[in-house]
């Protein structure tokens, strides 16, 4: 009898994607983050669905409804903290996944890489809108400041901001539409992730050596299903420890005060995972320039395939590029730190230097390093 997974139309798709998929035999734990991102998305959609059952998207009762979830709903506090910290886990996995892609040259699969950038933008938009929903001080002022950036667009800016707000300030209309978008976007992310996977399976996975692995493939199941399962268990253990012991560590205390349009918090800042981009935005004194730099800080990822000058795909045997990569990682940590600091000396100049270094490494130094390494290897 023919095995059902090879004949049934639906099972056949699952089989080709997760069971009989030929995978390189040498991919390391850095390749675990794709499946972990899938896990994060499932956790966020599941916990978000239960939160949405009790949440009210109204300016008068939004803050109270979140308090009600934490106090009165069975395990509501747990669901709320899983969802809030799940976003942080999502971005940790996301940034590690992107870092892996840069280090090992996975960006040479252009379609997969570009769909990944779209996924990053969608995830950032979803996280931003989710942060507005509890309607605390930082929610309200974060929404006001970030949406206001669109007013820097010449000619249509102001109209665009008022159109997004649904009025002349962030109010009930804004909260309601943000809730609607925050609910629908994760499903769009899930669909886009399927496209991401589709393009990846057209070419097959990259590997740490950055060389074709057609001569040495192994089936995805049981080898990588078990390997992914180990990653899932480790991440879940760390995540639940964090949620149960330090649930408020990454949150802003200001968000425990209800939104008040008449009282501006001394330091308006987004969640930690946006701080690097926020620091780049603030490092330029001009509003429009800052917005352009903010968008480019993410869009610059799309240039990686075009700026790849090295004859080797992976950085595994390219010491200069390796050094620059880790300087870039350190630079991102510095930008994240600066994004959470007030706008005053010496933080201003540190942020500006770190922002210039960020773009310099990606646009100039890495391509030049690739050319130098070609010369060193006489390629």
Curated annotation (Swiss-Prot):
It is a multi-pass membrane protein. GO terms for molecular function: metal ion binding; ubiquinol-cytochrome-c reductase activity. One of its GO terms (cellular component) is respiratory chain complex III. InterPro entries: Cyt_b/b6_C, Cyt_b/b6_C_sf, Cyt_b/b6_N, Cytb/b6-like_sf, Cytochrome_b, Cytochrome_b_C_euk/bac, Cytochrome_b_N_euk/bac, Di-haem_cyt_TM. The keyword Metal-binding applies. Heme b b566 binds at residues 97, 196. The keyword Electron transport applies. It is found in: Mitochondrion inner membrane. Heme b b562 binds at residues 83, 182. The chain crosses the membrane at residues 33-53, 77-98, 113-133, 178-198, 226-246, 288-308, 320-340, 347-367. It comes from the Eukaryota. Binds 2 heme b groups non-covalently. A ubiquinone binds at residue 201. Its main location: mitochondrion. Disulfide bonds: none annotated. Keywords: Electron transport, Heme, Iron, Membrane, Metal-binding, Mitochondrion, Mitochondrion inner membrane, Respiratory chain, Transmembrane, Transmembrane helix, Transport, Ubiquinone. One of its GO terms (biological process) is mitochondrial electron transport, ubiquinol to cytochrome c. Its cofactor is heme b. Signal peptide: none annotated. Belongs to the cytochrome b family. The cytochrome bc1 complex contains 11 subunits: 3 respiratory subunits (MT-CYB, CYC1 and UQCRFS1), 2 core proteins (UQCRC1 and UQCRC2) and 6 low-molecular weight proteins (UQCRH/QCR6, UQCRB/QCR7, UQCRQ/QCR8, UQCR10/QCR9, UQCR11/QCR10 and a cleavage product of UQCRFS1). This cytochrome bc1 complex then forms a dimer. Component of the ubiquinol-cytochrome c reductase complex (complex III or cytochrome b-c1 complex) that is part of the mitochondrial respiratory chain. The b-c1 complex mediates electron transfer from ubiquinol to cytochrome c. Contributes to the generation of a proton gradient across the mitochondrial membrane that is then used for ATP synthesis. Heme 1 (or BL or b562) is low-potential and absorbs at about 562 nm, and heme 2 (or BH or b566) is high-potential and absorbs at about 566 nm. PANTHER family: CYTOCHROME B. This is Cytochrome b. It comes from Chaetodipus intermedius.
């Amino acid at each position: 009898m023919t095995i059902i997974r090879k004949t049934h139309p639906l099972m056949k798709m699952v089989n080709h994607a997760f069971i009989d998929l030929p995978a390189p035999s040498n991919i390391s734990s850095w390749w675990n983050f794709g499946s972990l991102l899938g896990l994060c998305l499932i956790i966020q959609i599941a916990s978000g669905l239960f939160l949405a059952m009790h949440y009210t998207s109204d300016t008068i009762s939004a803050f109270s409804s979140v308090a009600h979830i934490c106090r009165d709903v069975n395990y509501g506090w747990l669901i709320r903290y899983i969802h809030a910290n799940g976003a942080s886990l999502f971005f940790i996995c996301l940034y590690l996944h992107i870092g892996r892609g840069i280090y090992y040259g996975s960006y040479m699969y252009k379609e997969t890489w570009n769909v990944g950038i779209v996924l990053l933008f969608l995830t950032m938009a979803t996280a931003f809108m989710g942060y507005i929903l509890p309607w605390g001080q930082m929610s309200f002022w974060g929404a006001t400041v970030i949406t206001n950036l669109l007013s820097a667009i010449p000619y249509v800016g102001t109209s665009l901001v008022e159109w997004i707000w649904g009025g002349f300030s962030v109010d009930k209309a804004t909260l309601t539409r943000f809730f609607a978008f925050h609910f629908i976007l994760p499903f769009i992310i899930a669909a886009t992730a399927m496209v991401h996977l589709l393009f990846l399976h057209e070419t097959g996975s990259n590997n740490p050596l950055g060389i074709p692995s057609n001569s040495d493939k192994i089936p995805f199941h049981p080898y990588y299903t078990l390997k992914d399962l180990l990653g899932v268990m480790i991440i879940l253990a760390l995540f639940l420890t964090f949620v149960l012991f330090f649930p408020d560590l990454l949150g802003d205390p200001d968000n425990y005060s209800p939104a008040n349009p008449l009282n501006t918090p001394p330091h308006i800042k987004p969640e930690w995972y946006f701080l690097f981009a926020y620091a780049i935005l603030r490092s330029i004194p001009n509003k429009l320039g800052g917005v352009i730099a903010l968008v480019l800080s993410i869009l610059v990822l799309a240039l990686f395939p075009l700026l790849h000058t090295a004859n080797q795909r992976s950085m595994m045997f390219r010491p200069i590029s390796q050094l620059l990569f880790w300087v870039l990682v350190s630079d991102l940590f510095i930008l994240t730190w600066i994004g959470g600091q007030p706008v005053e000396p010496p933080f201003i100049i540190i942020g500006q230097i770190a922002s210039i270094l960020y773009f310099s490494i990606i646009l100039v130094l890495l391509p030049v390093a690739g050319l130098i390494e070609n010369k060193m290897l006489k390629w």
